């Protein structure tokens, strides 16, 4: 709270090409079945990518859904998140841009802005931890927790029901 976060830098005026481009694979060489190729067409209508799309998504969020963000973000049947995760992950928008948009929304009295800012800080904190402690990606914070005595008996009725999507809890079984 009350920490200074620098304004986002503008786009660089020039980017140098790498000395050697990385190897790449052609999707056609993956020998995927027809069902997988069909999936591409289904996903394409939902994948809105690029910096302009990310900026538009952020603008729509802070002018609308941010007001209910505190409660709606936790409800799976509500469209209550910022939907910016993929844009942040791919670098189409930066956390500083989101931070300053959140600050402006908070200053305008939008109810969910403070929660949005906190969630953004938690996201960046988690990435910071993973960068400086890479084992967290596949292990526990404390290594002794790796020996936790989980109930792994596959004969348990609960495990079998979960594996088959038959727990009786619609959200879990979906």
Predicted regions and their residues:
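Conserved oxyanion/phosphate-binding beta-strand-loop segments in alpha/beta enzyme cores
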Residues: 139-151, 157-163
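Glycine/tryptophan-enriched, flexible segments
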Residues: 1-144
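Helix-hairpin-helix/helix-loop-helix acidic hairpins
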Residues: 160, 164-174
